[in-house]
Each structure stands twice: as C-alpha cells, then as structure tokens.
C-alpha cells in the first residue's frame, strides 16, 4: 500500500496505525485524529485504507462519513446524518435502518471534523451507543478516525464558540444543551492518537514539474 499510493513517512504512519489495529485482535478502541492543511494528503491516506480493507475482502468493516453531501460524495461516502440517523425521529424502524447501515462496521473515517460542534459529537456518540446497544462505550465502541483541518471550516451554526476546542464550553453546564456540549468536548479529549501531516504534496508535485521545465 505504501508503494502503491506513494505514501510519505507521515502518511505511512497514519495508515499503519489503522491497518495494524485492524489486524491484531482485542485492541483497545481506536480514537484517532488525522490532521493537516489542504494538500498534505489526508485523502491519500483514506484511499490507501479503503483499498487495504477491500483487498482483505473486509470493505464492510470500514465506512466513510462527512458532515455535508458534497464532502461525502467526493470521498465515496455518506453524510453522518444518513449513516447514523441523526436528526431523524428514532422510531424502531429508523433504528433498525441505522443498525443495518452499521452491520459489520468496525471503523469509521470521519472527514471535515472541524465542521462538528461539541454538541454534534455528543449526539453522534449517543446515537451510536444506542443503536449498537453499547451504552458504556463512546461511539458505541466503534473505532473512529477523525480527519480535517481546524484552521478551516468551523461549525456552520455557532462558529468557533461551539467548536470542539471552544474554551467557553464546560465552564457553566446548567442547561441540557450546555451539558451535552460539555460531554461532546470531553469525548473529543478522548481522541489521543494524533497524526499531523505537514508535508504539502501539492507544492512538492508543482516543484518537481517546475524543475522539469
């Protein structure tokens, strides 16, 4: 995979963390953040991971979601709203549909995480725990790989004040909404496996082309 997708050292490290985690049984739940500016190759890591699971004949274990339809379409994934049944009335039929969506799924690649508010993250984790009947585990015990660039695209509603890194969240959690925001922020703090891509692959390609002229 490293050679096929021409991964650099940073990209290879991110790929190996997920690939190795998927191979060895009885691993702790993976909660990972893959960060980096545009052009550093986050999508290339995703492509390598998708191909890895497909070659293992285990594509069902790996799903891709994003906050918007356009972002999801670019990655060949779904919106998290449709995949997880967020914003839908949780009837038995709807919960059964979400459970079917997640049948066999063990890894979720979540792109454009900067667009999530802290409350969004709480609602996602709460829904997954409910659907997968795993109330003790955040995100229903699924392995989560969040990706994005916090220098871009803050939450569409509320901006930086409701973001996962907002300092104002948790100071006073008196209402249900503020409590959910505080839990969401705490969930983000559980994401302790971090790989930041720093090498701009677009600039590298352009420099190579310039040298050939």
Predicted regions and their residues:
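Conserved ATP-binding/catalytic motifs of P-loop helicase motor domains
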Residues: 1-213
């Amino acid at each position: 995979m490293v050679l096929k997708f021409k991964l650099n050292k940073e990209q290879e490290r991110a790929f190996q963390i997920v690939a190795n985690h998927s191979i060895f049984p009885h691993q702790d739940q993976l909660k990972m953040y893959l960060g980096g500016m545009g052009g550093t190759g986050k999508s290339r890591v995703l492509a390598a991971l998708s191909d890895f699971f497909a070659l293992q004949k285990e594509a069902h274990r790996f799903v891709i979601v994003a906050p918007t339809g356009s972002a999801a379409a670019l990655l060949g994934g779904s919106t998290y709203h449709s995949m997880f049944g967020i914003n839908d009335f949780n009837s038995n039929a709807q919960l059964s549909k979400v459970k079917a969506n997640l049948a066999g799924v063990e890894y979720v690649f979540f792109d454009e995480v900067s667009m999530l508010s802290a409350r969004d993250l709480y609602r996602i984790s709460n829904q997954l725990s409910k659907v997968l009947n795993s109330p003790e585990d955040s995100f229903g015990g699924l392995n989560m790989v969040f990706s994005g660039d916090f220098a871009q695209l803050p939450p569409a509603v509320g901006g930086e004040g409701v973001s996962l890194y907002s300092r104002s969240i948790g100071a006073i959690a008196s209402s249900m909404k503020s409590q959910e925001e505080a839990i969401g922020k705490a969930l983000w703090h559980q994401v302790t496996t971090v790989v930041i891509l720093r090498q701009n692959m677009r600039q590298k390609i352009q420099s190579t082309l310039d040298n050939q002229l």
